[in-house]
């Protein structure tokens, strides 16, 4: 396959996120991968050792589970709470999960798949502060960031604060929003 990523790629990504989401990304922050799932797996491998714990908010995209298990890590479920018309984060339970010294990573699905929930800046900030306090790195799968209904606004997790930016990894891809997964 091709190993060189053209300069235009980096310009397209940085320009898109600046225009669409008000997030100014430095080119040096971008690492091209073949997709979000391989990126998530590689990040888990880089940030954990076998036996560490990875927090997920269930229900969640099933590939998260294999990415965690394939790296020898333990899955820690922080179930979302179902209300009459949506899902909500259980922050008290998240605090308990993150307080475990073996918890090293939290996989955040933003917007959430399969719940379709677009997290608010306040919810993301609360989640981020819990993870920061406990030394847990947030790995944000934001592949669905362009698939947001009118009236809702996607917020990139890492854009909320410098502390979050420096203690997180954001994974994105145009494959879902633009139906181009076959181009990989």
Regions found by a protein language model. Give the residues of each.
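A short helix->loop->beta-strand "cap" motif at the edges of active sites that frequently abuts
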Residues: 52, 73, 133-137, 165-166
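Short beta->alpha connector loops at strand-helix junctions that form conserved
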Residues: 58, 77-82
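Active-site PLP attachment segment
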Residues: 160-184
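Short acidic capping loops at alpha-helix termini that bridge into adjacent secondary structure
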Residues: 25-30, 50-53, 165-168
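A short helix-loop-beta submotif of the ANL/AMP-binding
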Residues: 70-76
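Conserved PLP-anchoring active-site segment centered on the Schiff-base-forming lysine
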Residues: 46-68
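N-terminal small-domain helix-loop-helix segment of the aminotransferase-like
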Residues: 1-35, 42
């Amino acid at each position: 396959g091709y190993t060189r990523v053209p300069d235009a790629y980096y310009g397209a990504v940085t320009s898109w996120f600046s225009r669409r989401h008000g997030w100014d990304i430095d080119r040096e922050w971008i690492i091209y991968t073949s997709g979000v799932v391989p990126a998530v797996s590689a990040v888990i491998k880089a940030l954990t050792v076998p036996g560490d714990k990875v927090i997920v908010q269930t229900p969640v995209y099933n590939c998260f589970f294999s990415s965690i298990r394939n790296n020898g890590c333990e899955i820690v479920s922080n179930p979302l709470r179902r209300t009459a018309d949506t899902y909500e984060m259980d922050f008290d339970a998240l605090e308990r999960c993150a307080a475990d010294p073996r918890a090293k990573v939290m996989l955040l699905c933003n917007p959430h798949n399969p719940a379709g929930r677009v997290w608010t800046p306040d919810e993301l900030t609360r989640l981020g502060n819990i993870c920061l306090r406990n030394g847990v790195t947030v790995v944000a799968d934001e592949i669905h960031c362009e698939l947001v209904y009118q009236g809702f606004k996607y917020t990139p997790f890492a854009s909320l604060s410098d502390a979050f930016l420096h203690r997180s990894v954001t994974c994105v891809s145009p494959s879902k929003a633009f139906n181009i997964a076959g181009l990989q």
